[in-house]
Amino acid sequence: MRLSNIFADTSKARPFAAGTSIFEKGDKGEEMYVVKEGEVDIFINDFHLETVIPDGIFGELSLIDRETRIASAIARTDCTLQVVDKRRFLFLIQETPVFAIQVMKVMADRLRRVDLLIAKSDFGRTNRGPQN
């Protein structure tokens, strides 16, 4: 099932022009987003982590851990985003297993990507922990 099927209701869809900041690192995270149209770039500081394409999600981490945003999101192109607040997010996680699995998959993919980046960086080569 595609996320766009879960979010067929466009009442909470919001347009963003290319170059518009959707959220910034350090912001309080009270919503997550599903890309309906267009593309969104995710940055950690000045590092480009990924480009989220239609049917992709972002901003979910702050809904789970209640911490501030660790990344910034900027509209790469003109885009339309489905906004999901905390109440709706919790409902979907509980009532729609496909949605819950999709969120876990996105988080796992991002964790793997960051793990690979750390392993390839100087940090990954110089901080291996205690040596026997």
Segments the model singles out, each with a brief description of its role:
Residues 1-132:
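Cytosolic regulatory regions built on CNB/CRP/Popeye-like sensor folds
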